Amino acid sequence: MYLIFLLFFAASYSMSLSSADSVTIYEDFVQCFKNVTTISDIDLSDVVLPRTSISFTPTLRAYIRNARFNTSSMPKPSIIIVPRVDSHVQAAVICAKTLNLQLKIRSGGHDYDGLSYVSAVTFLVLDLSNFRNITVDLNDGGGSAWVQTGATLGELYYRIWEKSEVHAFPAGVCPTVGVGGHVSGGGYGHMIRKFGLTIDHVVDATIVDANGQIHDRKSMEEDLFWAIRGGGGGSFGVVLAFKVKLVTVPKTVTVFRVDKSVDENALDMVYKWQFVAPRTDPGLFMRVLLSSPTQNKTSTVNTKLRALYLGKADDVVLKMAEEFPELGLKKEDCKEMTWIQSLLWWMNHVDVDKVKPEILLEREPDSAKFLKRKSDYVEKEMTKPELNRLFQKLATLDRTGLVLNPYGGSLNVTAVNATAFPHRHKLYKIQHSVTWPDAGPEAERLYIGNLRTTYNIMTPFVSKNPRSSYLNYRDIDIGVNDHGADGYRKGEIYGRKYFGENFDRLVRVKTAVDPDNFFRNEQSIPTLPPNRR
Ligand code: FDA
C-alpha cells in the first residue's frame, strides 16, 4: 500500500511545476491579490512569496515537522502566502479560487503526513504563523481565551499561566503543535479523562469561507460550527481563531513514571492497565509506551507508564495500591508540582524546578525527524497470551512503538455525534509510532515496514468495520487501497475510518458550504456527487 503511495508521489515529481509556470502563477496571483486588498508593494513582498524570494525556503521549512517531506525532491508550493491580517486570508482564498489553485492551510505544520505543505498537484501554502494573538479573560465565566490558529499550544498554556496557576486548557502535551490543526481535528492531552477533548471546550470561532467571507459562530450556522470541531481543518474554510473555555485545576498536581522490564512483570502490568486506566478516577491519566529494544540497550520490550493525577501524591498512591497493585507505585515515584510544571515534565524535563515556563514559547523552527504514525482504537481488553505475542514481535523490531492512551471518564458522558469526532466510547487509543535518524528510501522502507508489522498484528484486537483512525494522527495509507475509487467513493473510505457515522453529516455540511470543493486536500471531506444533491 505504501509503495503505491510512493510511486504516486514519484510520478508526480516529474509533473511538478516548471519555474516558468510558477512565475505565471505568481504574477496572476499578485495581480488578483492587489485588486482585492489595499496592500502596498513593500508589504506584498513579505506576504506573497514567490519561489525566487530569499524567504521562500526558510519559511517553507520553518514548520515542516516530518523530515520525510523536507527533501529537495518533494513537490514545493508555487507561492507561500504569509498573511498579516484577516483581509490577506480573505484575498488568498478569493484569488486561489479564482485561479483554480489548491490552497494548503498550515498553522503549526504538525500534520504527520505533511498534508499542510506538500501535494502531488500544483498548490499554494497559506502559512498562518503570524496569526498568534492570544487574549485570556479570567472574568468571562470560569475563564476563556480567544486564540488565533497560528499560535502554538505552548503559547496558549503560557499565556494562561501568566494570569493564573489554577486555570488550564485540556489539549495536547507537545507545545509546538499548532492550534489550527489540533483543535479542528479533535485534540486531546493528559486531562482528556477529566475534561474530554479540546473541542469540547470550543465556544466560538471565526472562519473565512469559500467565498472569502468571515463568519463567527452566529453567522456560520450551527452545522458548520459542529463540523469544525473534529471534522478537521482544510475541508470547510480557514479558521482564523477559536474561543475556548478554560478549566480549573488544583494548585498541586502529581506526576509519576514507572518503567518495567519484561523480567519485572511488565506484561502483567500492561494487562491490568487495560482494566484500570480507562475506569479509574477521571482525574488520573496513565499513558503506557511500549517500545522495541533500542540499539545497545536491552533485548526485551521497554514498558514505560507516565501519569498525571489532578491531586496529591498520597491520594494517588493509596488509590493505586487498591486498584492497581501490579504497578507497585510508591510515594518516591511521584512528584508534586503545579499544572504548568506538569507540562514541562511531559516534555521530558526531569527537574522541572530548573526549567522556566518560557520554554513553552519556543517554536523550534526547522526541526524535523523522519517519522510515520498510525492509529487504532481498542474496545475490548487483550488477553495475556495476545499481549505476549505483541511483546515477542515488538522485541524483534527496531525503533517501533505503541503508545496506549486510556479513554473513559468524561469521554463516556458525551454523545458520539455531539461533535464531529466520533471515537469517544472506547477503552483506549493506540498510536503506532516509528521515528528514525537516516534519510533515504531504504531506511524509510525498513522502518515503515516495522510499523506496518505491529499495525497488522493488532488487527484482531482493534475496532472493525471500519477500522477507526484518529484524524489528528494523519495516516495517508488509509485512503490508498481504494481499488480505483475516486471523489466521493474514495472520501468515504478514509472518511468512515476517521468519522464513523458522523461522515454523512460532514458531507452534507461540506456540500452546503463549499459545493465547488475549493477547500480540499488528499483526505478532505468530499462533496456529494451531483446526482445525489
Ligand atoms: P498543520 O498546520 O500541519 O495542520 C494540520 C491539518 O489541519 C492540515 O490539513 C491543515 O490544512 C489543517 N489546518 C491547519 N490549520 C488550519 C486552519 N487555521 N484552518 C483550517 N484548517 C487548518 N494530537 C493530539 O491530539 N494530542 C497530542 O498530544 C499530539 N501531540 C503531537 C505531537 C507531535 C510532535 C506531532 C507532530 C503531532 C501531535 N499531535 C497530537 C497531532 C496534532 O494534533 C495534529 O497533527 C494537528 O493537526 C497539528 O496541527 P498543526 O496546526 O500543527 O498542523
UniProtKB/Swiss-Prot annotation:
Species for this entry: Arabidopsis thaliana (Mouse-ear cress)
Name of this protein: Berberine bridge enzyme-like 12
Family: Belongs to the oxygen-dependent FAD-linked oxidoreductase family.
Cofactor, how bound (note): Binds 1 FAD per subunit in a bicovalent manner.
PROSITE patterns (UniProt xref): FAD_PCMH
The enzyme's E.C. designation: 1.1.1.-
Keywords from the named record: Cell wall, Disulfide bond, FAD, Flavoprotein, Glycoprotein, Nucleotide-binding, Oxidoreductase, Secreted, Signal
Domain FAD-binding PCMH-type: 73-249
Post-translational modification: The FAD cofactor is bound via a bicovalent 6-S-cysteinyl, 8alpha-N1-histidyl FAD linkage.
Cofactor(s) for this UniProt protein: FAD
Residues bearing attached sugar chains per UniProt: N35, N70, N133, N296, N412, N417
InterPro entries: BBE, FAD-bd_PCMH, FAD-bd_PCMH-like_sf, FAD-bd_PCMH_sub1, FAD-bd_PCMH_sub2, Oxid_FAD_bind_N
